[in-house]
Amino acid sequence: RHLYGLDSPEAMAALRRHDERLGELLGLLRKMGLEEETDVVILGDHCQLDVKEAIYPNYYFVKAGLAEVKKGRIRNWRAIARDCDGCCYIYVKDPECVRRTETLVTRMMERENSGIARMFTREEAAALGADPECAFVLEAADGYYFQNGWEEYRRKAGASDHHTDFHIQAATHGYLPDRDGY
């Protein structure tokens, strides 16, 4: 699902393989006479949503001088985005940069197709169970998710990229549980 999407032929084939394996297990229990005394519990680890683009908030933090790139990595920063797929933590090291960072994120959100649905304050984020050390939490809009890079603001998601960049996905998780269809 991460590489190809929720309802992709590849995801459906994987579900069929799991169904066959479960059928083999249940058949073996029946054959061994253990069916009545065995409890089989099947759990799913998480839900996902299809995505079309990855969003990189650090692009604007670097551009605004709130973060510096050295030797291919963000080294010095006053504000930085840390991805959590459908959500993104924004950390601000310098308390005097909180308002500037909030203004920058608000401007990002105002752009057409920003990929950002909501921004939560530190207090709102902590009440949701998020890291109380963050300054903000962003939730991605439908079809988007976050990544930590800085070279560009957005990048097309999907399986065609999976050989060159594992983090470019076609479906992901990490959204708030009140999300429609999640």
Can you name each region flagged by the protein language model?
Residues 163, 169-182:
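Short, intrinsically disordered, charge-balanced linker/junction segments flanking boundaries
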Residues 1-38:
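A long, amphipathic alpha-helix that forms part
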Residues 1-3, 84-89, 182:
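Glycine-rich, often proline-containing surface loops adjacent to acidic residues and nearby aromatics
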Residues 24-168:
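Secreted, luminal/periplasmic, and some membrane-associated catalytic domains
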Residues 3, 58-59, 174, 181:
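Intrinsically disordered, low-complexity N-terminal regions enriched in serine/proline/glycine
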Residues 10, 156-159, 181:
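A generic structural signal for solvent-exposed, polar alpha-helical segments
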Residues 5-6, 92, 130, 177-178:
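Generic structural "secondary-structure junction" signal
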